[in-house]
């Protein structure tokens, strides 16, 4: 059943995406889009998966989202990946989330398509994460 669902999704999703793209008014594209990456735990719970799986699934969608923004000429995208409230979560949930963020940002820098900036209260983050984020920013292209 999962294979059938995956196959249908791989066929139908590109058709759906193309239909949406045709309906967009590209003359009204915003210069800057901000997105709060939220709902991954709820998605995981609804799909009987772990929070870590939900956060990983959300992170995998970032590339798709940024690609859509490129296709529609959005110049600046702000992704709110972590709130200070998230930092008060239990370590068993927080640590995997921080690792997923580090991997996601590192992965974005490897594409070489986007200039990365890290904003926010980075002094509240663990040193290892701040280091990884700064390394990713340094590897991203200058634009």
Where are these regions (language model features)?
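Flexible, compositionally biased loop and terminal segments
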Residues: 1-143
């Amino acid at each position: 059943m999962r294979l059938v669902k995956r196959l249908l999704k791989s066929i139908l999703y590109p058709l759906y995406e193309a239909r949406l793209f045709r309906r967009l008014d590209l003359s009204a594209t915003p210069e800057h889009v901000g997105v709060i990456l939220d709902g991954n735990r709820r998605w995981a719970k609804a799909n009987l998966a772990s929070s870590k799986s939900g956060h990983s699934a959300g992170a995998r969608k970032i590339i798709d989202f940024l690609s859509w923004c490129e296709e529609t000429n959005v110049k600046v995208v702000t992704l709110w990946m972590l709130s200070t409230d998230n930092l008060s979560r239990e370590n068993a949930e927080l640590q995997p989330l921080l690792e997923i963020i580090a991997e996601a940002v590192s992965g974005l820098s490897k594409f070489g398509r986007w200039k990365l900036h890290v904003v926010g209260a980075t002094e509240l983050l663990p040193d290892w994460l701040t280091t990884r984020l700064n390394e990713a920013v340094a590897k991203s292209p200058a634009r």
